[in-house]
């Protein structure tokens, strides 16, 4: 697959990009910091990088604990079990991350986004259809056929990704 991304949803939001069959690194090696992009206007959420209201400040695991008073695992578990308040909050998280995913698809014409990270991985059955719905809700000419899927390497994907970047 020549045009794809890996998105980690964990204590931060990170993205690895492959465009035209090549890893996209950027001028300073910082391509993929989409977690520091803005998709809503929320100046109350402070990110570790100093931004206010970026995606990471709103949906990362530590942001969930800060915003909702529950750690991510507990809050997502409650949402999965049917807790209405947790479901409403998690739907909001998926809307924010879904917008970021859509922006990646719209900007880079991606075929596939593989998802991983501890927040996503442990609740993937609940989160994946919600994220897919948010991506597919916009501009079908761009999003039709785009695949969102759990990372095939599971919770080891970060290890392999780091090894892939080691120079020969």
Regions of interest found by a model, annotated:
Residues 1, 12, 31-34, 145:
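A structure-centric signal for secondary-structure junctions around beta-strands
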Residues 2-3, 23, 41-47, 51-168:
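ATP-binding/phosphotransfer module of carbohydrate and carboxylate kinases, centering on a glycine-rich
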Residues 6, 13-18:
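Short beta-strand scaffold segments in enzyme catalytic cores
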Residues 7-8, 27-28:
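Short Gly/Pro-enriched turn/cap motifs at secondary-structure boundaries
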Residues 10-12, 119-120:
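Short glycine-rich anion-binding loops that position phosphate/pyrophosphate groups of nucleotides
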Residues 16-20, 24-26, 39-40:
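Short beta-strand-to-turn element immediately C-terminal to the catalytic PLP-Schiff-base lysine
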Residues 30-42:
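A short, polar/charged loop-to-alpha-helix boundary motif
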């Amino acid at each position: 697959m020549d045009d794809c991304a890996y998105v980690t949803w964990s204590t931060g939001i990170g993205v690895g990009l492959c465009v035209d069959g090549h890893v996209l690194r950027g001028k300073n090696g910082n391509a993929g910091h989409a977690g520091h992009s803005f998709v809503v206007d929320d100046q109350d959420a402070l990110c570790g990088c100093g931004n206010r209201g970026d995606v990471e400040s709103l949906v990362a695991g530590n942001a969930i604990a800060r915003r909702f008073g529950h750690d991510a695992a507990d809050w997502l578990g409650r949402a999965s079990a049917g807790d209405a308040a947790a479901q409403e909050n998690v739907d909001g998280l998926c809307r924010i991350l879904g917008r970021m995913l859509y922006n990646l698809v719209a900007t880079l014409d991606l075929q596939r986004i593989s998802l991983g990270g501890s927040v996503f991985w442990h609740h993937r059955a609940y989160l994946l259809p919600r994220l897919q719905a948010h991506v597919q809700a916009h501009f079908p000419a761009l999003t039709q056929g785009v695949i969102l899927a759990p990372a095939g390497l599971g919770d080891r994907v970060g290890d392999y990704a780091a090894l892939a970047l080691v120079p020969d």
